[in-house]
From Swiss-Prot:
It comes from Bifidobacterium longum (strain DJO10A). SUPFAM superfamilies: 6-phosphogluconate dehydrogenase C-terminal domain-like, NAD(P)-binding Rossmann-fold domains. The active site is at K193. The gene is gpsA. GO terms for cellular component: cytosol. Its EC number is 1.1.1.94. It is found in: Cytoplasm. This is Glycerol-3-phosphate dehydrogenase [NAD(P)+]. InterPro entries: 6-PGluconate_DH-like_C_sf (IPR008927), 6PGD_dom2 (IPR013328), G3P_DH_NAD-dep (IPR006168), G3P_DH_NAD-dep_C (IPR006109), G3P_DH_NAD-dep_N (IPR011128), NAD(P)-bd_dom_sf (IPR036291).
Length: 333
């Protein structure tokens, strides 16, 4: 039997995931602040602003701009808001979400200023117990999901029964969720791979080839694994769909905003210029400094994140970034 599911945020990924939920037989309500998006989904089953490639969204998808109306009957509430705005946005929903509802995060990022993961931000904002929070992460490029190409993901919750409920609610013929209790690992994978994607994109944009990309990706994986384990994650998580899988998809596709943003930097655009031509938020940009700060907090070296922070804050070139990443000491891998 289908559930009542609300998706907070009608961006490309939120809308694509809403379609997955609708295809799985649920009644889906999208919440958005933009009246144009609300009316488009509600009246025409089309999100012309954020996901124009899908000509007709399922009939069992609707939309509202009213917070209370959006969540009042929800069994599951999915959060698909830009990570750095999550806390401010979610506070407005505190006390509105039903006590039985599971809250699921699609967000990927580390909050600037607090160095907190999205699971921490969501739970604090909504005063939510850990067993009612779940996160979803994996190699899930929104356009491919929207086109219903076969894909898999991982659902994490400290309560495995609740993880399974969420997974069942988003299982379709083309979308396969797996479950885990490693919330920390899943969150760290989703956040930190965006920084790696920025660096790979920058190298590609600057004209470097496969060797350079592979070097950045593998060192990025080592960096995010070390940081994740220090935060309490299971190292195995980093070698599954949420880790290596997401890294491969994000670092190798022009559909990835982080990769594309980095590529524009590599071609010589400034951060401001790359931001203007970006279609949506490249979460790796605000996350980079937060990753460096988190590494300092956990006493874990983050050379890739540090060099990318220099790119973003000081405007160093790709060659300077790579030179800084290499260093001069001979070390063990």
């Amino acid at each position: 039997m289908g559930k009542n599911i609300t998706v907070l945020g009608a961006g490309a990924w939120g809308t694509a995931f809403g379609q997955v939920l609708a295809d799985a037989g649920n009644t889906v309500t999208m919440w958005a602040k933009e009246q144009q998006i609300v009316e488009g989904i509600r009246d025409h089953h089309h999100n012309a602003v954020r996901l124009p490639s899908v000509e007709k969204l399922p009939d069992n998808m609707t939309a509202t701009g009213d917070r209370a109306e959006a969540v009042k009957n929800a069994d599951i509430v999915v959060v698909a808001i830009a990570a750095q705005f999550a806390r401010v946005a979610l506070v407005e929903f505190k006390g509105l979400i039903p006590d039985h509802a599971i809250v699921v995060s699609l967000m990927k990022g580390i909050e600037r200023g607090t160095n907190k993961r999205m699971d921490e931000v969501v739970r604090e904002s909504l005063d939510l117990p850990a067993d009612r929070f779940a996160a979803i992460s994996g190699p899930n490029l929104s356009k491919e999901i929207a086109d219903r190409h076969p894909a898999a993901t991982v659902v994490a919750c400290t309560n495995l029964d609740n993880a399974t409920k969420v997974a069942e609610a988003c299982t379709t013929s083309y979308f396969k969720p797996f479950v885990t209790t490693d919330v920390i690992g899943l969150e760290m994978c989703g956040s930190l791979k965006n920084v790696t994607a920025l660096a790979v994109g920058m190298a590609r944009g600057a004209g470097y080839g496969e060797n350079t990309a592979a070097m950045i990706e593998t060192r990025g994986l080592a960096e995010l694994t070390a940081l994740g384990v220090a935060a309490g994650a299971d190292p195995k998580t980093f070698f599954g769909l949420a880790g290596v899988g997401d890294l491969i998809a994000t670092c190798g596709s022009s559909l990835s905003r982080n990769y594309t943003f980095g590529a524009n930097l590599g071609k010589g655009l400034t951060v401001e210029e790359a931001t203007k031509v970006s279609n949506g938020v490249a979460e790796g940009v605000p996350t980079t400094d937060a990753v460096v700060a988190l590494g300092n907090q956990l006493d874990v070296p983050t050379p890739l994140a540090y060099q990318m922070s220099r790119v973003l804050n000081e405007g160093i070139s790709c060659s300077e970034m790579l030179a800084g990443l290499f260093g001069h000491e001979v070390t063990g891998e």
